[in-house]
């Protein structure tokens, strides 16, 4: 079966995939897939096809590669995007380039559009062996699937069961032109080391190793899917779809293995980087088994796991706002820091109406300076007439500890007046 027919068969299995965004590096693999998709589009005019090239700026040839990719797309009448990204070498070039690449693609992906990549069978072998080197479990050893989600991006890999030799033969027959990335010869990169030094020897000894690895990866994937299916009912009982939190109130009744599996399932639902064995053990010890009065945290990638009242939360990395003070006047709106949105103070019927995140409060008008802060540790006078510590007020409103310094507090001069949307100081 030729490549075009294989591609057609894969697309037939996913009839909803009619808007495609091809990740186009300009290398042999993506050039072959671009050619195949262009041919297929002639047969299926309803197919929407665009290509995106990520300019990493890591090579002195990067500008020429972008020009080459643009020219190829122009020849095929395919809409072309080029996005420049900045790589942070301190995070590791391979990992950061991958993350930056997916983030750039996410910025351009349209509704109902799916990212298409040219991963093939030999790429699958490399991915499997790298996961094995890291000590991955079933999730990691499942490697790549024809359709999956990575960094919240839907990805379609229609060539995953095709060999590199098939792609090379197609490129030769069609007289395609492509770029050669000189970094592919640099064995300091783990994938290159496997590709250039290790796998040729394995293939010389065992000619069918790529097929065998692909079967093993599929077995691992299916076993992980079965575990997810068996855990599904239990998981749904403890997972809150509204705030995406996980209850650990009854975790002590589960085996340690089941606790870890439920944690992984939750992280997978949130598309959070899977923890290493050491990280998972730390989460179990420092978060699940910690004393109830503790507020432990654990960072995973760009997310932070937190615990409050026997539930686990996942939040972005939050800016410390406790020191911030913002002046504001009546009939003024200002933007709050760290993406907290806009707050407005409007005079209305001899009161000051404060609006923030669909919450409203009314305060008396004042001639004093009005200030927004994010921290107060004194006492609050309640409508019932008695005073209560600020901490107890937050607890009564079930506000997690880390959110308490992200709620705007209104001050008249140095006097606390309101935690917007939650409670007022009746002094």
From Swiss-Prot:
<comment type="similarity">
    <text>Belongs to the tRNA(Ile)-lysidine synthase family.</text>
</comment>
<dbReference type="GO" id="GO:0032267">
    <property type="term" value="F:tRNA(Ile)-lysidine synthase activity"/>
</dbReference>
<keyword id="KW-0436">Ligase</keyword>
<dbReference type="Pfam" id="PF11734">
    <property type="entry name" value="TilS_C"/>
</dbReference>
<dbReference type="GO" id="GO:0006400">
    <property type="term" value="P:tRNA modification"/>
</dbReference>
<dbReference type="Pfam" id="PF01171">
    <property type="entry name" value="ATP_bind_3"/>
</dbReference>
<dbReference type="Pfam" id="PF09179">
    <property type="entry name" value="TilS"/>
</dbReference>
<keyword id="KW-0547">Nucleotide-binding</keyword>
<dbReference type="GO" id="GO:0005737">
    <property type="term" value="C:cytoplasm"/>
</dbReference>
<dbReference type="InterPro" id="IPR012796">
    <property type="entry name" value="Lysidine-tRNA-synth_C"/>
</dbReference>
<dbReference type="GO" id="GO:0005524">
    <property type="term" value="F:ATP binding"/>
</dbReference>
<dbReference type="InterPro" id="IPR015262">
    <property type="entry name" value="tRNA_Ile_lys_synt_subst-bd"/>
</dbReference>
<dbReference type="InterPro" id="IPR014729">
    <property type="entry name" value="Rossmann-like_a/b/a_fold"/>
</dbReference>
<comment type="function">
    <text>Ligates lysine onto the cytidine present at position 34 of the AUA codon-specific tRNA(Ile) that contains the anticodon CAU, in an ATP-dependent manner. Cytidine is converted to lysidine, thus changing the amino acid specificity of the tRNA from methionine to isoleucine.</text>
</comment>
<feature type="binding site">
    <location>
        <begin position="25"/>
        <end position="30"/>
    </location>
    <ligand>
        <name>ATP</name>
    </ligand>
</feature>
<dbReference type="InterPro" id="IPR012795">
    <property type="entry name" value="tRNA_Ile_lys_synt_N"/>
</dbReference>
<keyword id="KW-0067">ATP-binding</keyword>
<keyword id="KW-0819">tRNA processing</keyword>
<keyword id="KW-0963">Cytoplasm</keyword>
<dbReference type="InterPro" id="IPR012094">
    <property type="entry name" value="tRNA_Ile_lys_synt"/>
</dbReference>
<protein>
    <recommendedName>
        <fullName>tRNA(Ile)-lysidine synthase</fullName>
        <ecNumber>6.3.4.19</ecNumber>
    </recommendedName>
</protein>
<dbReference type="InterPro" id="IPR011063">
    <property type="entry name" value="TilS/TtcA_N"/>
</dbReference>
């Amino acid at each position: 079966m030729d490549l075009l027919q294989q591609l057609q068969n894969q697309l037939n299995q996913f009839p909803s995939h009619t808007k495609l965004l091809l990740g186009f590096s300009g290398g042999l693999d993506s050039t072959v897939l671009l050619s195949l998709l262009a041919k297929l589009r002639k047969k299926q005019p309803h197919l929407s096809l665009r290509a995106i090239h990520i300019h990493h700026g890591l090579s002195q040839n990067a500008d020429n590669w972008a020009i080459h990719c643009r020219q190829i797309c122009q020849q095929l009448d395919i809409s072309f995007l080029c996005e420049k990204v900045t790589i942070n070498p301190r995070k590791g070039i391979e990992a950061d380039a991958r993350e930056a690449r997916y983030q750039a693609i996410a910025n351009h992906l349209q509704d109902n559009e799916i990212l298409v990549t040219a991963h093939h069978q030999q790429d699958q072998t490399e991915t499997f062996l790298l996961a094995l080197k890291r000590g991955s479990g079933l999730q990691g050893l499942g490697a790549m699937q024809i359709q999956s989600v990575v960094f919240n991006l839907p990805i379609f890999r229609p060539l995953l069961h095709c060999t590199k030799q098939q792609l090379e033969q197609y490129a030769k027959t069609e007289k395609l032109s492509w770029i050669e990335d000189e970094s592919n010869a640099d064995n300091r990169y783990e994938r290159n080391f496997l590709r250039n030094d290790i796998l040729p020897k394995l293939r010389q000894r065992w000619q069918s190793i790529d097929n065998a690895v692909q079967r093993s990866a599929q077995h691992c994937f299916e076993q992980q899917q079965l575990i997810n299916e068996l855990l599904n009912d239990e998981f749904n009982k403890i997972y809150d779809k509204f705030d995406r939190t996980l209850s650990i109130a009854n975790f002590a009744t589960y085996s340690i293995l089941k606790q870890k599996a439920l944690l992984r399932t939750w992280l997978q639902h949130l598309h959070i980087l899977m923890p290493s064995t050491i990280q998972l053990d730390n989460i179990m010890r420092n978060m699940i088994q910690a004393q109830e009065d503790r507020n432990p945290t654990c960072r995973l990638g760009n997310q932070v796991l937190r615990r409050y009242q026997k539930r686990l939360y996942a939040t972005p990395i939050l800016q410390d706002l406790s020191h911030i003070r913002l002046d504001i006047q009546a009939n003024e709106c200002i933007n709050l820091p760290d993406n907290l949105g806009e707050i407005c103070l409007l005079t209305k019927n001899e009161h000051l109406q404060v609006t923030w995140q669909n919450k409203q409060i009314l305060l008396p008008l004042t001639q004093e300076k009005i200030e927004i802060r994010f921290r107060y540790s004194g006492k609050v006078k309640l409508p019932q007439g008695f005073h209560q510590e600020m901490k107890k007020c937050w607890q009564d409103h079930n506000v997690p500890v880390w959110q308490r310094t992200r709620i705007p507090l209104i001050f008249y001069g140095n006097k606390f007046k309101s935690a917007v949307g939650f409670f007022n100081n009746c002094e």
